[in-house]
Amino acid sequence: MDAALRDICQLSDPCDPRSFEPPIKDFFCIYPMYRSRYEAKAIQGSNEFLDGWNKAIEKDGLRNDGRPFLGCNTIYGNYVAWAYPECLPERAAHVAAYCDWGFFWDDATDAMSMEKNHEATKDLILTIMSTVGIGQKHEPLLAVNKLVVPFVLNKLAGTDGDLGLNHMKAWKAHLDGQARSSHANMSWEELKQHRLVEGGPEWAIRLGAWGAGIRCTAEEIESVREIIDIGGIAGVLANDYYSFNKEFDEHSRAGTIERMQNGVALLMREYGYSEEEAREILKKEINKMEQQFMDMYLTWLNGPVQKSRGLIQYLTMVLCLYSGTMFWMAHGARYHRTDLITTAEDRATIIGKCQGDAFRVMEGYPPPKGLKRTASSPESAPKRRASKANNINQSNGRGGDPMVAFSGPFVKAPSHICDAPYEYIDSLQSKNMRDKFINILNSWLNVPSDSLQIIKNIVQMLHNSSLMLDDIEDASPLRRGQPATHIFYGASQTINSANFSYVKTVIEATHLKNPQCLQIFLEEVSDLHRGQSLDLHWRHHGRCPTTDEYIMMVDNKTGGLFRLMARLMEAESPSPITTPHLSRLLTLIGRYYQIRDDYMNLTSADYTTKKGYCEDLDEGKFSLPLIHLLLHTSCPDRITSALYNRVPSTGLQDEVKTYILDAMQSARTFEYVREVLSHLHGEIMKTLDEAEKTLGINNGVRMLLVGLGL
């Protein structure tokens, strides 16, 4: 490995992390490490940024306890020199300042109440997305958020601006992950995947690519995603290991212990381990994944598959990032503060504060030494449930009379069997965009909380029910990366459960205060079914719709839920506001969501993971890309023959899908769809501007809609 690294690392030199004095007490990383020759530039960048930060934090009043903010600079040098050793000399100071801003911002917001944290995050995301995403200046409310604007405008969006934009997208995803994070009742395996998203390694990787000027295609990066993610999980768990004491202290001061996002805390809370035991488990897990990363890196590097110089630089940069970050965390004052007010005894109070009735069991490790109650085996509970479910009750009637059952009174059947398919799809991980949209619309409409919850219930049940039916109608095997509901429960039971959920939504609608709500509900649900009927009709008969017909279908099918939520909210609002701009805004949003979904289904690796490879083609769905292709290819009959002259319920061969994708490239279909999305996004933002003139400024709506364009 040394020879390979020396060939790639031209601006740095090998460095033995165990040669520093005084020696680091708790360092267990097994990665090789490199150190930049331009460390002085990074140190200077950090020093200059700290002055500006302290002034901003004082202006915002975010910390008044006198404790210093600690970041890149340490007794041994600067974080950037070890984590980004190949950073270009002219960018080292900028990267150091930006890293410090991220570290300090994280500390400042951790100490906030949940409400203030959400407001600060919203302010930051809107600033970043407006500045980089659509080129509109948004004046941040917080001085600490204003500090990032010059860097974003002059650096990330300047030279290598596309690399900078990639970084900002990753940073937004990191913030989104933290905003919806909750480790309550989560298993160890679930935590690892969750921390990979919320822990932010991707934004740090993209920053490294900008700092070093490394260029790779999205396809190249996806080809090494598995390697990156293994090391990424090890990295975020190492962060949890070294930052546990500090995080606990900050959350304790803020009264937000339940929001603590940390692997040590989870092992103590959900598995019953002591802090010492939890730390030992983390060490072993981290070293195991570090070794996996290095083995996979070397196998990939020496493998026969051709790879670009840029991709080799990219993955090597990731290795250096993981290595240098571990070294920095092991000794940096940011992670080893001496001004904590909480103790080991305080931290021990979270042991056993699990959500379930019993501790979880950590596979491959002995139970906690101090275990006082019986841990639940992951295998035992399902067996008990299965035994009860499969048992045949031989009792007929009462008192042994076999005829009593036939003449007895009506007994209502239990609902748990009917509910089970719905509960399954409701349990699958979702972005909850509809709930978010309802919440931010409510800044305008001020719907009472009880009515708002009913509307959320209606929209959630309708959405999930439609997904259950869609997956049957489309013969889709996957939903959100998991088996579709009908795979487990069968088509008949899934349809019955979806219909039962529709009945529940009607009941919910009758609980709303305004009698108009039931009529609104019936109108919009009728439109939803009309829109779906068009989609199914075209597919069944193999008839390609016009663009106008496609938009009509989308407005009724996808736009229906947006209109439903808004109309119900307007009806329940104590001060209803009627404006054509809001109605148009929701219509445009529905179109954008559907067309983007059409596009991503054919182009996104993430969609392939969650739904399957180009699943819309398997369905024979007349998406906007397919409509455009059939209108602009010289051989449309080849496409329609492959799509509609095949055995029902059989998918297309991958070779046929590849042919269709190549045909779309030749017809410039994807370029056309991107132009449509760009046009729609511009119209959405213009319509929002008009709506805000009547309804008032709504930064929540603006943040969500700006994010659509990234």
UniProtKB/Swiss-Prot annotation:
Record's Gene3D superfamilies? Farnesyl Diphosphate Synthase
Motif (DDXXD 2) positions are 470-474
Among PANTHER family, the record links this protein to: GERANYLGERANYL PYROPHOSPHATE SYNTHASE, THIJ_PFPI FAMILY PROTEIN (AFU_ORTHOLOGUE AFUA_3G01210)-RELATED
Described purpose of this protein according to its UniProt entry: Bifunctional terpene synthase; part of the gene cluster that mediates the biosynthesis of aspergiltriene A, aspergildienes A-D and aspergilols A-D. The bifunctional terpene synthase AuAS converts isopentenyl diphosphate (IPP) and dimethylallyl diphosphate (DMAPP) into sesterterpenes. The C-terminal prenyltransferase (PT) domain of AuAS catalyzes formation of GFPP, whereas the N-terminal terpene cyclase (TC) domain catalyzes the cyclization of GFPP into 5 distinct sesterterpenes: aspergiltriene A, aspergildiene A, aspergildiene B, aspergildiene C and aspergildiene D.
Question: One Pfam match, by short name?
Answer: Terpene_syn_C_2
Q: Which terms are listed as keywords in the entry?
A: Isoprene biosynthesis, Lyase, Magnesium, Metal-binding, Multifunctional enzyme, Repeat, Transferase
- Region labeled Prenyltransferase — which residues? 339-710
One GO term (biological process): terpenoid biosynthetic process
Segments carrying motif NSE/DTE: 239-247
Q: Where does Mg(2+) 4 bind?
A: D470, D474
What's its EC?
Answer: 4.2.3.-, 2.5.1.29, 2.5.1.81
Q: What is this protein called?
A: Aspergildiene synthase
The transmembrane residues are none
Positions with a binding annotation for dimethylallyl diphosphate: R479, K557, T558, Q594, N601, K611, K621
Q: Where is this region: Disordered?
A: 367-401
Pathway annotation? Secondary metabolite biosynthesis; terpenoid biosynthesis
User: What domain of life is recorded for the organism?
Assistant: Eukaryota
Q: Where is this motif: DDXXD 1?
A: 106-110
Q: At which positions is Mg(2+) 1 bound? A: D106
PROSITE patterns from the entry?
A: POLYPRENYL_SYNTHASE_1, POLYPRENYL_SYNTHASE_2
Q: Which residues bind Mg(2+) 3?
A: D470, D474
Q: Where does Mg(2+) 2 bind?
A: D106
Its gene name is AuAS
